């Protein structure tokens, strides 16, 4: 049996795991924490010799000792598939080869890496270590023709001692990497299958006597006033005889020395332990809200006082305890507002640079996120340093997932197999040792979706033996038999509420929810209401942070994103990897903006708006609101009536306080109170004045007495009637109706074509990812996407300066015997207004939800300048609207289109009182609904958006698709999660609604002023059901 198919052989010659740290020559240098400034740090990233092989045996024997001059090159770190070698494949949970534990395909893609590194004289007499922070999957190391060792565990640091193999001057380093190994069976995460040296490789030099490892711990007194810092240090002496040393240690608070002492006459023989502890009075406490860090600096000196090395460590005073079924951080109740984060770069795959990692964390902080789960494996060691600095609570997950066994009905197959215990336990042990000194880590997670069994229990006990200061999580320990937190994923709101009503003895979180695939997630507010209602639910992590699309460019220069199947890979899980709050290029999506608002730590509530009385609620757990300002603005239909700023003071953590706003005298217009809360100070992640949250409160409805629309340019209408059509002509317009469809086919205004495609009542939308289950289970089988419309009756009435066109149609799918009997009533007035009343009566049996009840038409493509009075500025839906407010907004059709990498319904604006689409000269169309509607406009047809699988497959139309929807199904998160809640569902049932279409010209009054008139002259009250008369 070879080494990569033997579960009892997890490594050879790999050093024991230990904390991640570096040695420096001075205290000043050490406190920079810049590893590249260390004289005994040598980065090996960059260009390497490389050759790709389909089989391990194809690698030539001379590879380990001879530089292959005719080979190509590859950048390290990189996934070799991203550099044009081998094949990418995306699966969510399935293994890409037959399950035959512990065996993997004999045709095992293999990368052979070589590079020369040069050691200066300064490395003589030193221990020389080589460290690999990430290699996928199995790799062997050779130096100067000598075998060093091998390792498994793709996302864990592997360290080897190569002191005996290196020399001053040039050295040949060779690494053979195989994509598949027995360890693949526990690395089946939801991501692209790829391989290579994808994190940094570097050399570390050590004096023969040095600090080998250390563990820092902080403990508070009962009053959480003073704290004890303790440190267990392991020192190593590689010399033949014992060495006497001094270990000095100093704790810095900025430039101030908090404590300084030493352990003198410390004799070191091989591995020797030492410890120190001291009290720190009233230390600043570390939390995600206030990530205050001290510097602990340890200096090791020889018997003559010469500095051997200086080792720094950032220290945060933080603890976590469980009490009364809740966990407490620094004796404070905390709720974790989190995300699940994979490593992914849209150009490099999992070879993620630290600039991108840092931007991720900055974006999280900007959007009120306070926790991150490293789904589902350890990150680059520097990730945790950044979390310490920026302030994020980390659930640090172990590199264990065997999800693929679920496909054969045995997800616990190896998790409950004692033969695999070493594999499982070793991974959590290596993980904890490496990252144990980070205050940001509050939870160790044993892995993900691997069933449950003896190996999980063994992992838990190993974790607790190493570190009893943190909580341990594993979601599939469903009864919380051993873990410290009970956890579920994708639990729906009603059951989540039930969990809150009947608390478990242990704290509860939901480690994955609100699947953020495509347009969504919806329903965040309803979830958050449950979380806030029940203290026992202390954490929630949206799935997931970032799309995993791979950027590509077509022949026309259009950027698009590849997903499963785009590389000819099969089986695959298609576009299931496009499920992030941010896009693959790190652009925030609408879902992230909604999440930011829903979890905002400063809440504003109305008490008595007539008196300007509000309430501010501080949902920070450690921090007052002294660094926040409230900005109030009273707006009336686009005009600011008053503004006010209030510096928030003396609002303690997790408390509330009254607020008083001075309201102006309001006129007849509809008015709102808009509140924005900003953070005053500049931070690492934001500028001063960074907005935290936005709220809107209605102050009054429009009470103006309606004035009928009566322009002075109206002329009598003429009606031209023939066998196929009828045309209504007025002062500056002509509208032609087809007698075959009952619809207008042409609308000319001042010589311009306004209408480009026949209008129609519409019950379908381009499928969004979160509606895929409804589409595949209901809509497609019932042919909703190909419903036909047939004219049953067409009538024309002319009287009193108006023409009525009445069309009665049936809209129904082929094959079935259900549908909607629809009535279109068009009132064309001499003044140019077109009043439209739409209604439908269902027949047959279809008791199910549908995407929408709406109306769509094609209009002149030049009318791309948009103004609307409704909810904005971003897209919004019934269950995803907290981040947007009602006002008058101006945009363009292009800007309102949310270009999802997998095209789908998008760009909706709710609660629209009126909208105008015009060209650059102000000519166009005004829409004034009888009651607020949903509105969207695209430069693409509905059919094209629905059929396209990638954004570059969208074919821009010459015209604009205008959608005026009565009801629109909420988003939900049912791509893998919760269905749309009952409140936001749309049913195939009787309906009635209406609106006015009015051509506008640049020289006429503005759309806003026109929209204030009353249209229809009693038409709507006669032709719409009572529900639409309000």
UniProtKB/Swiss-Prot annotation:
GO terms for biological process: lactose catabolic process. The keyword Hydrolase applies. Signal peptide: none annotated. It catalyses: Hydrolysis of terminal non-reducing beta-D-galactose residues in beta-D-galactosides. Pfam families: Bgal_small_N (PF02929), Glyco_hydro_2 (PF00703), Glyco_hydro_2_C (PF02836), Glyco_hydro_2_N (PF02837), LacZ_4 (PF16353). Keywords: Glycosidase, Hydrolase. Its EC number is 3.2.1.23. Changing residue 978 to G: Improve activity. The active site is at residues 449, 512. One of its GO terms (molecular function) is carbohydrate binding. InterPro entries: B-gal_small/dom_5 (IPR004199), Bact_Beta-galactosidase (IPR050347), Beta-gal/glucu_dom_sf (IPR036156), Gal_mutarotase_sf_dom (IPR011013), Galactose-bd-like_sf (IPR008979), GH-type_carb-bd (IPR014718), Glyco_hydro_2 (IPR006101), Glyco_hydro_2_AS (IPR023232). GO terms for cellular component: beta-galactosidase complex. The wild-type enzyme is an ineffective lactase. Two classes of point mutations dramatically improve activity of the enzyme. Heterooctamer of 4 alpha and 4 beta subunits. Belongs to the glycosyl hydrolase 2 family. This is Evolved beta-galactosidase subunit alpha. It comes from Escherichia coli (strain K12). The lineage of its organism: Bacteria, Pseudomonadati, Pseudomonadota, Gammaproteobacteria, Enterobacterales.
């Amino acid at each position: 049996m070879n080494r990569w198919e033997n579960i009892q052989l997890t490594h050879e010659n790999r050093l024991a795991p230990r904390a991640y740290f570096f040695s420096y020559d001075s205290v000043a240098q050490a406190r920079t924490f810049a590893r590249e400034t260390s004289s005994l740090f040598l980065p090996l990233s960059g260009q390497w010799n490389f050759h790709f092989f389909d089989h391990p045996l194809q690698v030539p024997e001379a590879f380990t000792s001879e530089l292959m001059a005719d080979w190509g090159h590859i950048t390290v770190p990189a996934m070799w598939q991203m550099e044009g070698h081998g094949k990418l494949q995306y699966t969510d949970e399935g293994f890409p080869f037959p399950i035959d534990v512990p065996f993997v395909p004999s045709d095992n893609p293999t990368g052979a890496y070589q590079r020369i590194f040069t050691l200066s004289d300064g490395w003589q007499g030193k221990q020389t270590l080589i460290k690999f922070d990430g290699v996928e999957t199995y790799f062997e190391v050779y130096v100067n023709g000598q075998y060093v060792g091998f390792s498994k565990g793709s996302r864990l640091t592997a360290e080897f001692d190569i002191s005996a193999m290196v020399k001053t001057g040039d050295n040949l380093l060779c690494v053979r990497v195989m994509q598949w190994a027995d360890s693949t069976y526990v690395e089946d995460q939801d991501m692209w299958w790829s391989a290579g040296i994808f994190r940094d490789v570097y050399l570390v030099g050590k004096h023969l006597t040095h600090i080998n490892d250390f563990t820092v711990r902080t403990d508070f007194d009962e009053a959480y006033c003073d704290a004890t810092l303790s440190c267990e240090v392991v020192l190593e002496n590689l010399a033949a005889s014992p060495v006497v040393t001094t270990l000095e240690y100093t704790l810095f608070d900025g430039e101030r020395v908090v404590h300084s002492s030493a352990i003198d006459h410390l004799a070191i023989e091989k591995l020797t332990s030492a410890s120190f502890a001291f009290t720190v009075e009233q230390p600043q406490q570390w939390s995600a809200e206030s990530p205050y860090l001290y510097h602990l600096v340890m200096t090791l000196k020889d018997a003559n006082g010469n500095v051997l090395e200086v080792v720094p460590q950032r220290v945060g005073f933080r603890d976590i305890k469980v009490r009364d079924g809740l966990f407490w951080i620094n004796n404070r109740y905390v709720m974790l507002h989190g995300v699940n984060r994979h490593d992914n770069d849209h150009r490099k795959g999992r070879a993620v640079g630290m600039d991108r990692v840092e931007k991720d964390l900055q974006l999280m902080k900007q959007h009120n996120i306070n926790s991150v789960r490293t789904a589902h494996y350890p990150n680059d060691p520097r990730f945790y340093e950044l979390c310490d600095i920026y302030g994020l609570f980390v659930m640090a997950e172990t590199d264990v997932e065997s999800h693929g066994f679920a496909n054969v009905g045995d997800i616990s197959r190896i998790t409950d197999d004692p033969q695999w215990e070493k594999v499982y336990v070793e991974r959590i042990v290596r993980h904890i040792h490496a990252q144990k000194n980070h205050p940001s880590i509050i939870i160790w997670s044993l892995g993900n979706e691997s069933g449950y069994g003896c190996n999980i229990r063994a992992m838990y006990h190993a974790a607790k033996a190493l570190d009893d200061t943190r909580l341990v999580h594993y979601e599939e320990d469903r009864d919380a038999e051993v873990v410290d937190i009970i956890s579920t994923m994708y639990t729906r709101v009603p059951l989540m509420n039930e969990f809150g009503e009947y608390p478990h003895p242990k704290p509860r979180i939901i480690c994955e929810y609100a699947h953020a695939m495509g347009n969504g997630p919806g329903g965040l507010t309803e979830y958050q209401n449950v979380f806030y209602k029940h203290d026992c639910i202390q954490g929630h992590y949206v799935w997931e942070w970032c799309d995993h699309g791979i950027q590509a460019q077509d022949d026309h220069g259009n950027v698009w994103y590849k997903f499963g199947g785009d590389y000819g890979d099969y089986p695959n899980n298609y576009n299931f990897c496009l499920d992030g709050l941010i896009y693959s290029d790190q652009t925030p999506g609408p879902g992230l903006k909604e999440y930011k608002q829903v979890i905002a730590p400063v809440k504003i509530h109305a008490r008595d708006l007539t008196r300007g009385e509000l309430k501010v609620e501080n949902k920070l757990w450690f921090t007052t609101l002294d660094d926040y300002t409230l900005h109030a603005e009273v707006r009336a239909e686009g005009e600011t009536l008053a503004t006010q700023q209030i510096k928030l003071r003396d609002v303690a953590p997790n408390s509330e306080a009254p607020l008083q706003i001075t309201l102006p005298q309001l006129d007849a217009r509809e008015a709102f109170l808009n509140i924005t809360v900003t953070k005053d100070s500049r931070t690492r992640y934001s500028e001063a004045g960074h907005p935290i949250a936005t709220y809107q409160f209605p102050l009054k409805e429009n009470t103006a007495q309606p004035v009928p629309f009566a322009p002075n340019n109206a002329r009598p209408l003429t009606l031209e009637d023939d066998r196929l059509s009828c045309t209504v002509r007025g002062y500056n317009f002509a509208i032609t109706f087809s007698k075959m469809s009952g619809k207008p086919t042409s609308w000319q205004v001042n010589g311009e074509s306004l209408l480009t495609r026949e209008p129609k009542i519409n019950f379908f939308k381009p499928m969004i990812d979160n509606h895929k289950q409804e589409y595949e289970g209901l809509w497609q089988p019932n042919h909703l996407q190909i419903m036909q419309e047939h004219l049953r009756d067409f009538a024309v009435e002319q009287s009193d300066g108006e023409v009525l066109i009445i069309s009665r149609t049936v809209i129904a799918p082929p094959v079935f015997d259900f549908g909607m009997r629809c009535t279109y009533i068009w009132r064309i007035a001499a003044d140019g207004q077109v009043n439209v009343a739409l209604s439908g009566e269902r027949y047959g049996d279809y008791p199910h939800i549908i995407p929408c009840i709406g109306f769509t038409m094609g209009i002149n493509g030049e009318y791309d300048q948009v103004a609307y009075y409704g909810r904005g500025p971003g897209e919004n839906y019934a269950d995803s609207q907290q981040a947007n407010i009602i006002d008058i907004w101006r945009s363009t059709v292009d800007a309102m289109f949310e270009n999802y990498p997998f095209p789908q319904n998008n760009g909706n604006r709710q609660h629209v009182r009126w909208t105008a689409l015009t060209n650059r000269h102000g000519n166009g169309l005004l829409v004034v609904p009888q009651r607020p509607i949903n509105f969207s406009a695209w430069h693409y047809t509905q059919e094209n958006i629905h059929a396209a699988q990638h954004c570059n497959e969208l074919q821009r139309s010459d015209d604009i698709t205008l959608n005026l929807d009565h009801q629109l199904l909420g988003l939900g998160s049912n791509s893998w999660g919760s269905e749309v809640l009952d409140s936001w569902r749309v049913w195939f049932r009787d309906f009635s609604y209406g609106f006015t279409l009015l051509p506008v010209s640049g020289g006429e009054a503005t759309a806003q002023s026109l929209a204030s008139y009353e249209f229809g002259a009693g038409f709507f009250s006669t032709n719409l059901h009572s529900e639409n008369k309000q």
